[in-house]
Amino acid sequence: MARDLIGPALPPGFKERATVEDQERDPSPVAGPALPPNYRSSSSDSSDSNEDSSSLSEEGNQESEEDDAGPTAKKQRRNQDRDDDDDDDGFFGPALPPGFKKQDDSPPRPIIGPALPPGFIKSPQKNDKGRENPGQVSPFFNSEEAESGEDEDIVGPMPAKGPVDYSVTAEFEKRAQRMKEKLTKGDDDSPKPVTRESWMTELPPEMKDFGLGPRTFKRRADDKSGDRSVWTDTPADRERKAKEIQEARKSLSKKDEENMLSGRDKRLAEQVSSYNESKRSESLMDIHHKRLKTKAAEDKNRHQERTPFDRDKDLKVNRFDEAQKKALIKKSRELNTRFSHGKGNMFL
C-alpha cells in the first residue's frame, strides 16, 4: 500500500519522490472524507482500469460458480448487488459505521423565509443527477386545505356573534334629531374668532427675591407697586380707561359744586373773622406759630459757637419707636375732621 497523504497536495510542477517501497506497496485512498460516487480522481484511472479487468474476470468466475450452484443462488446474488447500488446512490460525505443503518428517506429541509399561501404548492423537479430540486411555485389550489384553513386565515374584523340590531327607521330618526339640534343650537362648524390665551396677554405674578427672602409669615399684605396693565393693554383697553377717567372727573366736579360755599356763607365768614381779630385775643395755635418763627430768625442771626456734646442733638436719637410713631401719625390725620366745619352750611 502507498503511504497515506496528510496535508495539502504539491503543486503540479513538483513531482513527488517515489521510493522503492512505495512503488511496491498498493495504492491506498487519500486520508479525509470520501468523494461522491460520480467523481473520481485522475490518479486512480490506471488503477481503475486494472480493477475493472480484475472485476470482469471475477464476475466471470462468479457467474460460472452461480451456474453450477443453481438459479436460487443467482437470484440472491442479484438482489444483493441491487441493494448495494441503492445504498451508494445520492450519498455525500464519509460512510457510516457498520453498526448504523442508513435511513431510507432523508429528513425534509427546514423552510427559511415566509411561508407560501395555502393555495400554492411547490412542484419538485428532478436534477440531471437524479435528485429532486424544489421547482417553481404552482398556483394549484387545494380545496381540502383551503376548507381546513378557512377559520385560521380570517383577515379583518370578526363577524357578529349575535343578532345585529339595525333598523332603517331608527337611523332616520337619529339623523333628523341631529339636524334639529344643529339648527336650534347654531352651526358649530362656523369659524370662531381667534383669541389669545391669558398667559400671552397678561403679565406673570410679581415675584420678589425669587425665593431668597426670609422664611417667615407675612405680617401684612404687600402693597401694590402700581398698575402693571400698561404693558399688556390693547387700544380698546386704553380707550375704555380714558372714558372711565373722564367720567370720574365729571363726578368729582359735581361734588365740588355741591360743596361750594354759597354767597351768604362767604359773607358771614368774613364778618366773623373781622370780629375775632378786633374783639377776641389770639388763639394758642397762632401764638405757638409766632414763637417758632421768631426763634428760628434769632437762631439764624446768632453767631455759632462750639457747644459741648449733646447726645440728643448730635446723634439725633429717635425717642419714639416705630409703633408710637405710627400711632401719632394716625391721630394727627384725624385732627382736620374733628375741628373743621361741616361740608354743608357753615352758619345756621
UniProtKB/Swiss-Prot annotation:
Residue interval(s) of motif GPALPP motif 1: 7-12
Segments of skewed composition (Low complexity): 41-59
Keywords assigned by UniProt, alphabetized: Acetylation, Isopeptide bond, Phosphoprotein, Ubl conjugation
Residues with N-acetylalanine modification: 2
InterPro entries reported in the protein's UniProt record: DUF3752, GPAM1-like
Superkingdom to which the source organism belongs: Eukaryota
Biased composition (Basic and acidic residues): 14-27, 177-195, 235-269, 277-287, 295-317
Motif GPALPP motif 4 per record, residues: 113-118
Region listing for Disordered, in residue ranges: 1-163, 177-317
Positions carrying Phosphoserine: 28, 106, 138, 143, 148
Compositionally skewed regions (Acidic residues) per UniProt: 60-69, 144-154
Cross-link (Glycyl lysine isopeptide (Lys-Gly) (interchain with G-Cter in SUMO2)): 279, 316
Motif GPALPP motif 3 boundaries: 93-98
Motif (GPALPP motif 2): 32-37
Protein name, UniProt field: GPALPP motifs-containing protein 1
Organism: Rattus norvegicus
